[in-house]
Structures are given as structure tokens and as C-alpha cells.
Amino acid sequence: MAPTKKAKKSGENINNKLQLVMKSGKYTLGYKTVLKTLRSSLGKLIILANNCPPLRKSEIETYAMLAKISVHHFHGNNVDLGTACGKYYRVCCLSILDPGDSDIISTTTTTQ
């Protein structure tokens, strides 16, 4: 039971940090805008839902590797990611341009 509690707690931690980014930072939502930020190397972190289509996922990961931007795989589907962002719609991928008051970039790179 302890590992599941730890996984749930880290998931809640990511959700809290993501909400802080939504309030105080800059971000883009959606596949096309994420690709634009990757091409221009503006993003600091890319977050993908676990049910993101494989072709989109591989394309985003390839662009992120070329731009040297880290990718975090969210442990929920696109509905959960949209809810964590405080939106009422599904979010497949998002790019964090400026984390604001949140330290989400340092915590997600150390957990992977």
C-alpha cells in the first residue's frame, strides 16, 4: 500500500504545481502551439497526457529532443490533465514557457 500512496501523493504534488503555473506563469495548451514553441525553443517543459496518440507523442518527443527540452508524461488521461490545469476541456499536451512561482521544472526532471 505504501508505493501507491507515494505515487498518489506525487501526482497531487504535480497537480498543485501545475495549478500554480496556471496562475502565475506562462503556458500554451494544444498540439499545434506546443509544436510552435518547440520549433522556436521557447518552452522549458512539455507535459503529455498518457492517452496522447502515439504519432503525436513521438513527434513532440523528437522535437523536444532536438530543442533539448524535457518531456514529462502525466499519469492521467487528457481529461485529468485538463482538470489539473483548471480547464473544463481536455488537454492532450501543454508547454510551460515560464513557470512563474512554481518549481515544477526542477521536480519533474528529478523524478524521471
Curated annotation (Swiss-Prot):
Superkingdom field: Eukaryota
Gene3D superfamilies: 3.30.1330.30
Membrane-traversing stretches: none
Matches recorded under InterPro entries: Ribosomal_eL30-like, Ribosomal_eL30-like_sf, Ribosomal_eL30_CS, Ribosomal_eL8/eL30/eS12/Gad45
SUPFAM superfamilies: L30e-like (SSF55315)
Entry keyword annotation includes Zinc-finger: no
Known tissue expression: Expressed in roots and leaves.
GO cellular component: cytosolic large ribosomal subunit
A family per Pfam: Ribosomal_L7Ae
Molecular function, one GO term: RNA binding
Keywords, in A-Z order: Ribonucleoprotein, Ribosomal protein
NCBIfam families documented for this protein: PRK01018.1 (NF002172)
Matching PANTHER family: RIBOSOMAL PROTEIN L30
Name listed for the protein in its UniProt record: Large ribosomal subunit protein eL30
Naturally occurring in which organism (per UniProt): Triticum aestivum
